[in-house]
Amino acid sequence: AASDVYKRQTIQYGDADVMIAGGTESSITPIGIAGFSALTALSFSEDPERASIPFDKERNGFVMGEGSAIVVLEELEHAKRRGAKIYAELNGYGCSSDAYHITSPAEDGSGAATAMLNALKDGGVEPEELTYINAHGTSTHHNDLFETRAIKLAFGEHAYDLKINSTKSMVGHLLGAAGAVEFVTCVKEIQEGYIHRTVGLRETEEELDLNCLLYTSPSPRD
C-alpha cells in the first residue's frame, strides 16, 4: 500500500508518467512462523474453516499467506493518449501514525480513522458518499475490534450503512503483499460489481456490529 502511495505521489508531482507498484511476500518459513507464534498472533484453530475468520467472535489470530500483486499506475491523460485500458482511478490516499505501540494500534482507533479521513479529503469524497470498505481485518482480537472502532469514529452513524469485508478471510495475511493484493481485489470488485463475503464469519460479538458481510449472507452486487 505504501508503494502505491509513493508512486502516486511521484506521478502527481510530475516526476513520472508511469510507475509500477505492488508487493510480494514469501514468509512461510520456520523463522517467520516462530516469530509470529512468539507474538501469539497466529490462529491456533485446527479447523481450516475456523482459522482466518475476521470479525467473528471466535477469532483467535491470523493465518499467514503468501502472494504478490503488481499494478501499473499512470497519469490519466497519458493513459488516454496511448489508448490504455483503465481499470480504476486512484483518487486519494491517507496516512497517519498514532505512535501507540510497535504492533498494536491505539485502542480507540484514532490513528486509522485519521488515515481514512485523510484519504477521503485528498480524493474530494465526503464520508457519506462511501459505500464499501475493504478492511485490514486480520482476525486478531485487537485489530478487528480497534478497526471497527476506527470506522465508527471516522464515519459516525454512516458506518452502519457501509458494506465491509476482509480479503484475508480467503487468503490469510500476506504481510508485505497484503495491501497490493487487496488493492487489486477492490479494483476487480468495482469492475465486476461484486463484493465478496467475509469467508468464515458466522457470528460477531456485541461491539463488532457493522455489516461485515457474514459468510451466510448473499454477496451484494451494486
List each model region and its residues.
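Conserved small-residue
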Residues: K7, F36, V72, L90, ...
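Beta-strand segments within the central parallel beta-sheet cores of soluble alpha/beta enzyme folds
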Residues: M19-T24, K85-Y93, E128-A135, L162-S169, ...
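Active-site-proximal alpha-helical scaffold in enzymes
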Residues: S3-E25, V63-A84, H173-I195
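Conserved catalytic cysteine-centered active-site region
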Residues: A1-D4, A38-V63, R149-A180
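Short glycine/threonine-rich loop-to-helix capping motif typified by GTGT followed
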Residues: Y100-G109, T138-F155, L174-V181
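Conserved small/polar residues in nucleotide/adenosyl-binding loops
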Residues: A1-Q9, Y215-D222
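Flexible, low-complexity linker/loop segments at domain and module junctions
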Residues: G123-E129, Y160, D209-S217, R221
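Condensing-enzyme catalytic core mediating Claisen C-C bond formation in acyl metabolism
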Residues: D47-G123, Y132, T198-L201
